[in-house]
């Protein structure tokens, strides 16, 4: 796994801020941004339309420092007074750099904030999203709350892909869960960040992705409690490019690589590393059985192949071969 660039270098810069920003706001929604200004406009509008009496702010992080395409959209919303908050440019490129910048800025500016939510810049929050997420955190006492991300496909003929493991939500009912895996619809309480230390997202996952899986895995190991709220829905715009078999296969390889590296981090002894190697090899024949079962139940070859592709991704990562989809050169939109 390739390490990211060092954390030193050009500083972050606040490039837009709403008038009379109140640092005592207790809820902050963080939005990493990269080359999707029109989608960001819809994301921000969905936050403006939230059905809640709770005061909240937004922190947007532009991670394309050369073009800064998201900044005009962010500035317009902030200047209009529709949403309180600010926009920061993070010049160090990468998924984890952007997310760390968002959470670190939110904690530093909003010193009384206790609840930090995240939504991606290609997602739209349902009207009750924030109220349900924060309410679940308050009622259950959970340290981390997650909710479903449902796809909106540009091509309606592709809606069947919602059953594919690469798109399907992890859980289907509200309640306590052992862990969540994605940060595209999550709430994290401040003590989680304080206990895990900085940077929150390990920069070794900066270009591969999976910093969220690693973060939540570490949270579970120190005893943090997780809760899933099925009604706190976020919708994700899925372009046609992400419905191609090649993209879905690459995502499966990436999932396998992420799973391997998260486990490799805690395999600190020769015995544990040997056991992990055996597990990686054993997953290949086991994945074939799983693939046969999925084919017989789903009758979709693309779905059935997923376990085998994930297993292959883990094996390839073990020998140093892995995708890096969050490098700027690999991102088109």
Regions found by a protein language model. Give the residues of each.
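Non-catalytic, C-terminal membrane-associated alpha-helical segments of glycosyltransferases
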Residues: 250-257, 268-333
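Acidic donor-binding loop at a coil-to-helix junction in glycosyltransferase catalytic cores
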Residues: 206-217
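N-proximal low-complexity "stem/linker" segments adjacent to membrane-targeting elements
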Residues: 2-46
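A recurrent flexible, glycine/aromatic-enriched loop bordering the glycosyltransferase active site
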Residues: 171-188, 206-208
């Amino acid at each position: 796994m390739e390490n990211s660039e060092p954390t030193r270098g050009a500083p972050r810069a606040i490039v837009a801020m709403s008038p009379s920003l109140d640092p005592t706001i207790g809820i902050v929604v963080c939005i990493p941004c990269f080359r999707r200004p029109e989608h960001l406009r819809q994301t921000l509008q969905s936050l403006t339309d939230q059905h809640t009496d709770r005061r909240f702010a937004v922190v947007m992080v532009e991670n394309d420092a050369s073009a800064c395409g998201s900044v005009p959209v962010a500035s317009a919303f902030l200047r209009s007074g529709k949403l309180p908050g600010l926009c920061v440019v993070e010049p160090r490129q990468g998924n984890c750099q952007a997310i760390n910048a968002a959470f670190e800025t939110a904690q530093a500016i909003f010193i009384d904030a206790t609840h930090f939510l995240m939504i991606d810049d290609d997602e739209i929050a349902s009207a009750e999203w924030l109220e349900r997420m924060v309410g679940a955190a308050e009622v259950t006492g959970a340290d981390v709350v997650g909710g479903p991300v449902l796809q909106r496909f540009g091509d309606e003929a592709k809606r069947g892909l919602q059953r594919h493991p690469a798109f399907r939500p992890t859980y289907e009912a509200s309640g306590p869960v052992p862990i969540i895996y994605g940060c595209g619809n999550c709430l994290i309480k401040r003590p989680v960040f304080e206990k895990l230390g900085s940077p929150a997202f390990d920069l070794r996952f900066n270009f591969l992705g999976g910093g969220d899986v690693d973060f939540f895995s570490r949270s579970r190991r120190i005893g943090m409690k997780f809760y899933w709220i099925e009604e706190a829905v976020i919708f994700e715009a899925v372009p046609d490019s992400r419905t191609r078999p090649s993209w879905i296969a690459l995502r499966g390889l990436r999932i396998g690589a992420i799973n391997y590296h998260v486990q490799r981090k805690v395999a600190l002894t020769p015995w544990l590393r040997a056991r992990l190697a055996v597990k990686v090899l054993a997953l290949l024949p086991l994945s074939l059985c799983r693939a046969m079962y999925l084919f017989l139940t789903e009758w979709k070859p693309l779905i059935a192949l997923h376990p085998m592709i994930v297993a292959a991704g883990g094996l390839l990562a073990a020998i140093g071969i892995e995708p890096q989809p969050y490098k700027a050169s690999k991102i088109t939109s």
